[in-house]
Amino acid sequence: MQWEVVIGLEIHTQLSTQSKIFSGSATTFGSEPNTQACLVDLGMPGVLPVLNKEAVRMAVKFGLAVDAEIGQHNVFARKNYFYPDLPKGYQISQMELPIVGKGHLDIPLEDGTVKRVGITRAHLEEDAGKSLHEDFQGMTGIDLNRAGTPLLEIVSEPDMRSAKEAVAYVKAIHAIVRYLGICDGNMAEGSLRCDCNVSIRPKGQVEFGTRCEIKNVNSFRFIEKAINSEIQRQIDLIEDGGKVIQQTRLYDPNTNETRAMRSKEEANDYRYFPDPDLLPVIIEDSFIEETRATLPELPPQKRERFQSQFGLSTYDASVLASSREQADYFEKVVSISGDAKLAANWVMVELGSLLNKQGVEIDQSPVSAEQLGGMLKRITDNTISGKIAKMVFEAMANGEGSADEVIEKRGLKQVTDSGAIESMLDEVLAANAEQVEQYRAADEAKRGKMFGFFVGQAMKASKGKANPQQVNELLKAKLEG
């Protein structure tokens, strides 16, 4: 039987506010346990929550970025459940009236197409604390520094049909929240976490299958692996005559399997009701328009502009627009070099490889956009060849200065003098007289292969400095003359 996969995602983004959503406690990551939790965060009697206006602004900003309805009358509710790191015995969240309603996001796929994924809603809520199991010899420690940190939970429609589509969607959300400056997107620190709802159904069936939720997956790679593992588990289960049970599961990267955590709760299991300590939030038109005015050019618009303005492919434009820092770097390189396609290739391939090797982001690149742009200009004006450029790039990465300084210091300037190149070619052909005779006696097909040998010898003789185009033209004339 052929199966269709149905995936919906819930993404929890920690908002980059200075203080918590309902208290004045700081939100700095990595502080000593329980040093950033006040009486409100601890759920002590007699204290009242006060809503952080900046968290509201950030939620509205996200809603506008995904063409969503803004809930101008939204309400906080208590989500009741017991967990050791939830001091109040309930979490303040939103249920019936969220701050962000229906929207959508267009995501670029690997095959160059773009898919629209619906966004059901996004709501504000407070994060819980953290349970620490490692250092307490059979006991569990509780760190409440994270309790009360503002979260925006973004819920998608079940529109994705493969793990790769799900990863593309998470990457698109990740890019948007970073562009907007509302979340740092650091998945290793838990700033962005993903719950994956996965079900399968026979191809052509309209009704959804029974879904399972994989909780708190915190990397793009693990999202893909967890979903694929769960898909296979469900297929094997049904094809062996079993039945999928609705449940919450955890992904174990060591075994590449999901395992049952608990039965999946429904909304009414949490006994939601409006929080009596918080008034409904009324958002005025003027607040929405003020926030709209602060929106930057976002990845989808930037991707389209890169395609139309620079003639880039959908894939290249998507990669370059995936982070604000990378897009800015690329545009700076283009403005200096004047060649967008060459700039795209160097930023994505050579620079990308260097950054991966050094384990740094583009804003910490050892080669600045000015340096790279200057070097590419020297390729386009034939001062250096593409091969020599790699040596120059490496030298710049090692702190040897600008491209011009490296070229001058190392004597790497490309030879473009036709007379000098001809003289060098005469020496190469004289040293390989036997091969020259074989070339002249060969048919067209064999000549093509042999020609590469002479080009290689010529470039070796010039130490890579001869202009490759001139070498090709002059060599062809000499061999066939």
Curated annotation (Swiss-Prot):
UniProt cross-references to SUPFAM superfamilies, sorted A to Z: GatB/YqeY motif, Glutamine synthetase/guanido kinase
Family: Belongs to the GatB/GatE family. GatB subfamily.
Superkingdom as given in the UniProt entry: Bacteria
GO molecular function: asparaginyl-tRNA synthase (glutamine-hydrolyzing) activity; ATP binding; glutaminyl-tRNA synthase (glutamine-hydrolyzing) activity
Pfam families: GatB_N, GatB_Yqey
Function: Allows the formation of correctly charged Asn-tRNA(Asn) or Gln-tRNA(Gln) through the transamidation of misacylated Asp-tRNA(Asn) or Glu-tRNA(Gln) in organisms which lack either or both of asparaginyl-tRNA or glutaminyl-tRNA synthetases. The reaction takes place in the presence of glutamine and ATP through an activated phospho-Asp-tRNA(Asn) or phospho-Glu-tRNA(Gln).
Record's subunit section: Heterotrimer of A, B and C subunits.
Source taxonomy: Bacteria, Pseudomonadati, Pseudomonadota, Gammaproteobacteria, Pseudomonadales
GO annotation, biological process: glutaminyl-tRNAGln biosynthesis via transamidation; translation
Name the UniProt record assigns to this protein: Aspartyl/glutamyl-tRNA(Asn/Gln) amidotransferase subunit B
Catalytic activity: L-glutamyl-tRNA(Gln) + L-glutamine + ATP + H2O = L-glutaminyl-tRNA(Gln) + L-glutamate + ADP + phosphate + H(+); L-aspartyl-tRNA(Asn) + L-glutamine + ATP + H2O = L-asparaginyl-tRNA(Asn) + L-glutamate + ADP + phosphate + 2 H(+)
Top-level EC class as recorded in UniProt: ligase
